[in-house]
Amino acid sequence: MARTVNCVYLKKEAEGLGFQLYPGDLGKRIFDNVSKEAWALWQSKQTMLINENKLNMMNVDDRKFLEEQMINFLFEGKDVEIEGYVPQKDDE
């Protein structure tokens, strides 16, 4: 049976992550409070941030920026702003 967490992002009970994906205290906080669904949403935003901002994960400043964005997105309810990105509209 999958473990559930009270997801701070989705604001509901949801399936939790299978294991701690991020190191340290922040990783523990994510494991305890973020669902698989919310983590998947973050991963798509993270990919967009890396690509659009040409972030280098070997660069400490770029990793710190990405971590700050992750905290804002998952725990503070702030959406990720990607300069120049316009979401595709559904044609109805």
Swiss-Prot record:
Q: Name one GO cellular component term.
A: cytosol
- UniProt source species: Shewanella piezotolerans (strain WP3 / JCM 13877)
> PANTHER family recorded for this chain?
FE(2+)-TRAFFICKING PROTEIN-RELATED
Gene3D superfamilies this protein is in? Fe(II) trafficking protein YggX
Matching HAMAP family, A to Z? Fe_traffic_YggX
Similarity comment text for this entry: Belongs to the Fe(2+)-trafficking protein family.
Q: Which Pfam families match?
A: Iron_traffic
What functional role does this protein have?
Answer: Could be a mediator in iron transactions between iron acquisition and iron-requiring processes, such as synthesis and/or repair of Fe-S clusters in biosynthetic enzymes.
Q: Record keywords: Transcription included?
A: no
Gene Ontology biological process terms from the UniProt entry: cellular response to oxidative stress
What does the record give under GO molecular function? iron ion binding
The entry's protein name is Probable Fe(2+)-trafficking protein
